[in-house]
Amino acid sequence: MSSLIKSINLDKINHSQSTVKDYILLMKPRVMSLVIFTCFVGMLLAPYSVHPFIASIAVVCIAFGAGSAGAINMWYDRDIDSLMKRTQKRPIVRGAIEPDEALSFGLITGFFAVFFMALCVNLLASFLLLFTIFYYICIYTIWLKRRSIQNIVIGGVSGALPPVIGYAAVSNTISLQSVILFLIILIWTPPHSWALALFCNEDYKNCKVPMMPTIKGALYAKKQILIYSFLLFIVSLMPFFIGMSNFIYLIISGILGLVFLYYAGSLFYDTPDNKQAKRLFVYSIFYLFFIFLLLYLTNTILSISER
């Protein structure tokens, strides 16, 4: 009898642990981590000081705001997630979380994220967070994703807003500096997403999501990736020319951008297993991380040298 009770208790503990993990997965933690990082850099680049407690609340609100959008996205896309290999293990598809529970979780976390941002930080940051959640769910997920070949180009607005929210959380303004951070992510999104679509092309075909390689073909998509990579190279240098960073940033970001262009160009010589597309996809993640980290470090050096 004691062994049976122990077994039941262990099952309850394991179920509880898996549920917590599943709710974390529901919020798309990989995407959330990049959102938090770019938001935090936006906060650090703002030319104002903020109390660490307020800054912490802002970061938590943005994290849960992003998580709520991810949860509602999984709720809405549960039908096509079951058809794609890379999304078949998501919590709703596996039955770990019921669709209604996921929707409720997303709505509640989103509401409290926006509410506490308004209550503890400022109304501008709260409005931008609300707009970002709305845009990702309604404009991208519901309207564009299954209808337009430009889904991630237009839909990328929501993914590019976190540093603007972070900047606004500290300064209560939107400036040229935060707009440039926005543009870097906005232009980075198409080559990043289309590289993924190149090696997941069959998945997108199966679920009938009109990604660029699926509708226009791989060659056309590769040309578009190269164009956007060139635009990204130009935009990534802008922080130097508006006095947001120093010469070190110009040199290193230029090198990182040239490597990005190299990987984009190598797509035209890709193998059937899409090896180069996978390399570009992975590199693009590291690229964005290092560009934002470099911006923060060189901006800090510039600020110290001007004192």
UniProtKB/Swiss-Prot annotation:
Pfam families the UniProt entry points to: UbiA
Catalysed reactions listed for this entry: heme b + (2E,6E)-farnesyl diphosphate + H2O = Fe(II)-heme o + diphosphate
Main location: membrane
Stored InterPro entries: Protohaem_IX_farnesylTrfase, UbiA_prenyltransferase, UbiA_prenylTrfase_CS, UbiA_sf
CDD domains named in the record: PT_UbiA_Cox10
The enzyme's E.C. designation: 2.5.1.141
Membrane topology: Multi-pass membrane protein
Biological process according to GO: heme O biosynthetic process
Note in the entry: Carbon 2 of the heme B porphyrin ring is defined according to the Fischer nomenclature.
Stated name of the protein: Protoheme IX farnesyltransferase
Originating gene: ctaB
